[in-house]
Amino acid sequence: MNQGKIVQIIGAIVDVEFPRNNVPKVYNALKIDGTAIILEVQQQLGDGIVRTIALGSTDGLKRNLIATDTGHAITVPVGTGTLGRIMDVLGNPIDEAGPITYTDQWEIHRNAPSYEDQASTTELLETGIKVIDLMCPFAKGGKVGLFGGAGVGKTVNMMELINNIAKAHSGLSVFAGVGERTREGNDFYHEMKDSNVLDKVAMVYGQMNEPPGNRLRVALTGLTMAEYFRDEKDSSGKGKDVLLFIDNIYRYTLAGTEVSALLGRMPSAVGYQPTLAEEMGVLQERITSTANGSITSIQAVYVPADDLTDPSPATTFGHLDSTVTLSRSIAALGIYPAVDPLDSSSRQMDPLIIGEEHYNTTQRVQQTLQKYKDLKDIIAILGMDELSEDDKLSVSRARKIERFFSQPFHVAEVFTGAPGKYVPLKDTIRGFKAIVDGEYDHLPEQAFYMVGNIEEVIEKANKMTA
């Protein structure tokens, strides 16, 4: 048994001295005698001293306490026993529902699947949210980022996606709450419980009030549980299709920044850790699909000060298949979900994947919206009357499209009083195609606001004129 003693404690950082010929490896977990605290080795400083980060509060620790090297990285329970349970970063239950019965324990630091093991798919994942399905469709087994500043609706959009996809999806889901509000974690738990899909969801939380070590590692804990479901073959010899929700990737980066500063590394641009790209890559490269099973991940990404060029969101962009950008200016118009249709993108936007009709409709919608955007300055200075008849028509259609992008959410029913709407992709394409074709030029634009499919628009317009 390899034992050392604590020689220094600075906040969440603990230095431990071991015999020089028996120094623990980086990422090894150390247990401190008489406590439940786990330390993770981050650096080897020489002379047998290792610098570690504490996963938990360091209150009550003192020098000369004995720390034992476990000989491996942090392990967490995996398997069906984790479903319906809320766990912390170490896989300990925090829902007061008794111990977790697990089939196996896996280390949270793992290699990404090799290049030949990876598989790609072109199958679309329908979300029932019009603006997403039309402008930035998701791929099954792909990675999606929800980008947005403070208070534009990332978590509400995430909850609606969980509501629409996880409930319809017969597979399993893992939710990793990384540095977010405890209230949101609680809301999510009750949302799943009320909709009877709790037994298909594993929840891992490292919330805002926890030390940086917990927030940094909780995303890896959730990912490890998802990887087990993907890789573990069932009776048919196949793994499962798993949904992985991470809220919020920015807090993962921020926890890394805190740890990096505590470890004494020189900060890089905007104060971020110099290892930002590598840390992001280590997490994102593991979120992938293999021939065995798939992981479809939906990640919320906070954008500091609404600046998409900030190093944290900018580093995340390169790893994603679809990006959904939420805009404060669209939220200010009262259009929810506040997705910016011209700033959101998807690698699936190819006529060979989504079909000619969908592709052409999307292109025409984008052209109409772009034309309206270009004309906004002229309208602001000279007014609508100075526009040509063609331009007036384009502006009218663009405003209808903008309003038709809004829709009532199931998860927002309690606030709005309007029942949520799930719109199938074929109805979405049909509706927007009809608008750009000019079939509804005679209807008032208010009729397009906060409805589901195009039939509801006609019904609403009839009520308004009645």
Swiss-Prot record:
Membrane topology value: Peripheral membrane protein
Domain of life per record: Bacteria
PROSITE patterns: ATPASE_ALPHA_BETA
SUPFAM superfamilies attached to this UniProt entry: C-terminal domain of alpha and beta subunits of F1 ATP synthase, N-terminal domain of alpha and beta subunits of F1 ATP synthase, P-loop containing nucleoside triphosphate hydrolases
Alphabetical list of CDD domains matching this protein: ATP-synt_F1_beta_C, ATP-synt_F1_beta_N, F1-ATPase_beta_CD
Molecular function terms from GO: ATP binding; ATP hydrolysis activity; proton-transporting ATP synthase activity, rotational mechanism
Swiss-Prot/TrEMBL keywords: ATP synthesis, ATP-binding, Cell inner membrane, Cell membrane, CF(1), Hydrogen ion transport, Ion transport, Membrane, Nucleotide-binding, Translocase, Transport
Translocase recorded as keyword: yes
Pfam family, one: ATP-synt_ab_N
Binding site for ATP: G148, G149, A150, G151, V152, G153, K154, T155
Compartments, record wording: Cell inner membrane
Keyword DNA damage applies: no
Catalytic activity reported: ATP + H2O + 4 H(+)(in) = ADP + phosphate + 5 H(+)(out)
EC number: 7.1.2.2
Complex and partners: F-type ATPases have 2 components, CF(1) - the catalytic core - and CF(0) - the membrane proton channel. CF(1) has five subunits: alpha(3), beta(3), gamma(1), delta(1), epsilon(1). CF(0) has three main subunits: a(1), b(2) and c(9-12). The alpha and beta chains form an alternating ring which encloses part of the gamma chain. CF(1) is attached to CF(0) by a central stalk formed by the gamma and epsilon chains, while a peripheral stalk is formed by the delta and b chains.
Protein family according to the UniProt entry: Belongs to the ATPase alpha/beta chains family.
This protein's name: ATP synthase subunit beta
Species name: Xylella fastidiosa (strain Temecula1 / ATCC 700964)
Gene this protein is translated from: atpD
